[in-house]
UniProtKB/Swiss-Prot annotation:
Residues annotated to bind ATP: 216-223, 368
This enzyme's EC code(s): 2.7.1.21
GO biological process: DNA biosynthetic process; TMP biosynthetic process
InterPro entries reported for this sequence: Deoxyribonucleoside_kinase (IPR050566), Herpes_TK (IPR001889), Herpes_TK_C (IPR013672), P-loop_NTPase (IPR027417)
Bias (Basic and acidic residues) ranges: 9-18
Job of this protein: Catalyzes the transfer of the gamma-phospho group of ATP to thymidine to generate dTMP in the salvage pathway of pyrimidine synthesis. The dTMP serves as a substrate for DNA polymerase during viral DNA replication. Allows the virus to be reactivated and to grow in non-proliferative cells lacking a high concentration of phosphorylated nucleic acid precursors.
Subunit structure comment from the entry: Homodimer.
Family of this protein: Belongs to the herpesviridae thymidine kinase family.
Annotated gene: TK
Organism from which the protein derives: Saimiriine herpesvirus 2 (strain 11)
A Pfam match: Herpes_TK
Protein name per UniProt: Thymidine kinase
Active site residues per record: 243 (proton acceptor)
Keyword annotations: ATP-binding, DNA synthesis, Early protein, Kinase, Nucleotide-binding, Transferase
Amino acid sequence: MTGRGQPPKKNDTYDYPRKQPPKNGSYDNYDYPTSTKTRSTNKQRKDSNYPPRETIFEPDLAADPIYSVPRPPSRVPHKLVKVNYKSNLVPITASNSVSELLSLHDETQVTECVEAPLIAKSPDITVYEKMFSVRPKHTLTKLEGKQKMFTRKKKGSFVKIGSNMLEFGESLKSKLHNDSKKSPDEPDGLVHVPVHLLYPPKHQDPVPAFFIFLEGSIGVGKTTLLKSMNGILGGKNVLAFHEPIAYWTDVFSNSLEEVYKLTLPAKVGRTSNSAKLLACQLKFASPLLALKTATDRLSSPKNSLLSSDMWVMFDRHPLSATVVFPYMHFQNGFLSFSHLIQLWSSFKASRGDNIILLNLNSQENLKRVKKRNRKEEKSVSIEHIRLLNNCYHAVYCAWLLVQNFTPEEIVEVCFNAKHITDLSSSKPSFLAKHVSTEDMLKSSIFNTWIEMTKAHRDSCTLMECLLTFCKELEKVQLIHVNVSPFTDDIPGLWASIYTSIRRNSAIKPNRVNWLALEDLARTFNSQ
């Protein structure tokens, strides 16, 4: 403890209390005992009539000593009291009477400032920095300023993306809960669920009908032929299942648009790109495989020996989505071989699947693609169409091999357990009379399998995958038809297809539930 009015021990961080003002009442020549941190500002303080910091006097205390309390501006009271002292001070002792004390009180005038300032004088900021150890504000360099500006822009973009995601979530939620639109015939906004397909009507007498799947490059004329079949056959003897464009473009995402973005030249060899392309191809295959399963439930597995003029026609077989187009993406370098095997393993077929492979000149094919003007197909080039036709040809060559040799023999050849020439010599086939089986193997998709699995010939899983694929491919019948002579002659094209079907003894009709198939076709095409 120090005595009243006596400074403590020397400490540079302490602002010593001030002594009593001089008797002349002037602050001009008053020497302020200050610390080393505030000594440099004495010259500025002498120019003022009042101390530069707030001075508070309490009336109940004596005027000696006077303490100066620095406060931040936010805590300074709005009203200050100015005390005027008389210069001739009389010491007070115990012998003073009450009247003398009262006279001394009258001589001390306490007046209220008419317009009290917030503080007596605004102190220099350097004084506060030294007294309270306030760090000066860091001045950003040019590089730091750019980084801060970039962070703000990036934060703003993230906020914008977040708001867009919230809007997308709300729209998706409304779609899932069917709150966005109400159909005019359903006032409650409930979607018509096709539960009637779960309980198909029973047909007393199954009808023999041919299952025809139209396949080929994009824009080759499959949809045009399918739409013309009602006029050619009268409408009562044909059921048409169109391409599920609505499912590919509207359900969850637009896979048609996405697949063309994923097949840009700059995305060759990317693993993440291959995974996305695999997801798109599986989405393409989903409605085709589902429709294939549904029609198989409504048909008899036994082939009918009777002739028939009833036709069930499809725009594409699962062969295109699981085998042909993935093989084209692999040839271009967009799809990895492991993902190609996954798609080939998902290929399914049935006895009685008759695939009509339509082929057209590449130049004419490109003109048809540009003429229909689909926004997803704007980037299609003639090289794309030629490569796609070559992939269909490779699948056709593989089908010819499977038709002339057993699936087990094909697997042995693909795993280098046997040579294709040994098979052709021990078992004369139809191919040996026309083309070389070795050349046919090199032109087929099996040649790619041989090259890509040389290091994994001991894998039983790969062997089973290839065997399953060959057994599924063996079930179908492929007919190659050239469309070029029938550019504007749809009936002539159908006549050529009809003649090829009748000449092929392996193509036979199936017994089907016609009423249930009609209901399925009506529901499938309406979506």
